[in-house]
């Protein structure tokens, strides 16, 4: 039997393979590289007599789908048979992150895009720290800035060029702070970036998660810090921008700790591209006008498959093999991975190895297995009881993260 040519139903493949073979032989092929890494073609079925174990309940920051949906986005995964890799972890160099930190943004500046008419009339720039840096897009001509006391600054006269860029300047620190006005000529919309380096006014923005499912909500937190302490703002809103350009705007509500929060519902058909969150605020602090804008991002997935919450665990040759049950809604190539942990002599958990497997799956109840070689476990010096951490399921054809669980399964031995 060629292990790469699998039928859509693993049980059918197993029946045909047994009928074709006059003598028993292993159901998988392991190819070991000289460096000790292994390539394992995924086994077709677990022993029917093996006990079924349940995954641990998802923790607060884990990602787990309650149901599956069919995606209208076609899978782009290239054709190929099932495959699995297992490799040991170098305890001295591997930096494992089972719970990736959500994307966040920290800024001391602001940005905006204005049309040519607004640029001719004058665009207000709130400067809260002397010597701010600013840059405009190349379409701007005859650039000038009016200071709060009415003086006009031009390139070379109050506007200090930065390097060879003719449209990047630093304001003369002697011009102070306040509401400046930028004027220029242009035939197209102009993007303006302002950065107040070293400012004591800092905007922090963070989503509660880096991945959410379509139909869920993004929980967003923002706060303006003045010398490290949160301060109130007059205007603060967030705009969720989908890859197709659709936007949703929400105001943020102040909390007792001085931060501001909002929930942004995620609707639409996601694809592999991230969704961006743009936050804008205006505030007056210690008599100074402060404007800040920040952009962060989240990934949005459609749960095209999910782990049902059960696994069949066996110990072939005293190694570890865990076969996970999946509920699949859309054709694609799916990948499963986890990190095996064992106990050292002090009774502390340490990582042993990473296992990954992938296969093209059709809708229905399917399985993916992870396997850890007995020699690999023995070489680690770690012992049972073992645990599987950082369990992840990914739709490779659509680049969707479908499951991520920091501590997934305590093995029976």
Describe the role of every protein-language-model region:
Residues 102-104, 109-110, 137-166:
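Surface-exposed beta-strand/loop patches in noncatalytic accessory domains
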Residues 115-126, 152-179, 187-197, 270-271, ...:
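Beta-sandwich interaction modules
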Residues 136, 211-214, 225-235, 327-336, ...:
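A short beta-turn/strand-edge loop motif at beta-sheet boundaries
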Residues 156-170, 176, 254-266, 362-376:
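Aromatic sugar-binding surface patches on proteins
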Residues 175-192, 270-287, 380-397:
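Short, aromatic- and glycine-rich surface loops/edge beta-strands on solvent-exposed regions
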Residues 192-206, 211, 285-311, 396-413:
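Short beta-strand elements
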Residues 210-216, 313-317:
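Short, solvent-exposed loop/linker segments at the N-terminal edge
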Residues 215-228, 240, 322-325:
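Beta-strand-rich structural segments
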């Amino acid at each position: 039997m060629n292990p790469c040519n699998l039928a859509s139903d693993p049980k059918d493949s197993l029946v045909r393979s047994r009928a074709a073979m006059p003598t028993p032989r292993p159901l998988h092929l392991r190819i070991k590289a000289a460096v000790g890494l292994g390539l394992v073609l995924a086994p077709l079925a677990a022993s029917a007599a093996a006990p079924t174990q349940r995954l641990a309940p998802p923790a607060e920051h884990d990602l787990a789908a309650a149901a599956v949906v069919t995606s209208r986005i076609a899978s782009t995964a290239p054709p190929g048979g099932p495959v699995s890799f297992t490799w040991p972890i170098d305890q001295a160099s591997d930096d494992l992150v089972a719970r990736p930190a959500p994307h966040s943004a920290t800024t001391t500046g602001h940005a905006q895009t204005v049309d040519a008419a607004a640029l001719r009339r004058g665009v207000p720039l709130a400067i809260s720290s002397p010597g701010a840096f600013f840059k405009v897009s190349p379409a701007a001509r005859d650039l000038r800035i009016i200071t709060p006391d009415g003086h006009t600054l031009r390139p070379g006269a109050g506007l200090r060029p930065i390097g060879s860029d003719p449209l990047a300047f630093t304001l003369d620190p002697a011009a102070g702070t306040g509401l400046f006005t930028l004027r220029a000529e242009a035939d197209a919309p102009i993007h303006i970036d302002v950065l107040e380096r070293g400012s004591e006014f800092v905007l922090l923005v963070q989503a509660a998660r880096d991945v959410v499912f379509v139909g869920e909500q993004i929980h967003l937190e923002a706060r303006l810090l003045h010398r490290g302490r949160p301060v109130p703002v007059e205007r603060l809103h967030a705009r969720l921008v989908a890859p197709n350009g659709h936007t949703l705007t929400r105001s943020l509500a102040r909390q007792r700790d001085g931060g501001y929060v909002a929930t942004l519902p995620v609707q639409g058909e996601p694809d592999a591209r991230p969704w961006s969150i743009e936050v804008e605020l205006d505030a007056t602090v210690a008599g100074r006008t402060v404007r800040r804008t920040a952009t962060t991002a989240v990934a949005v997935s459609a749960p095209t498959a999910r782990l049902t919450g059960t696994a069949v665990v066996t110990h072939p040759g005293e190694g570890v093999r865990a076969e996970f049950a999946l509920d699949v809604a859309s054709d694609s190539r799916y990948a499963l991975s986890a990190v095996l942990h064992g106990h050292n002599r002090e009774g502390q958990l340490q990582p042993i190895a990473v296992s990954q497997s992938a296969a093209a799956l059709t809708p229905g109840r399917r399985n993916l297995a992870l396997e850890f070689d007995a020699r690999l476990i023995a070489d680690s010096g770690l012992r049972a009881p073992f645990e599987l951490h950082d369990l992840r399921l990914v739709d490779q054809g659509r680049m969707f993260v479908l499951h991520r669980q920091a501590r997934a399964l305590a093995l029976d031995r």
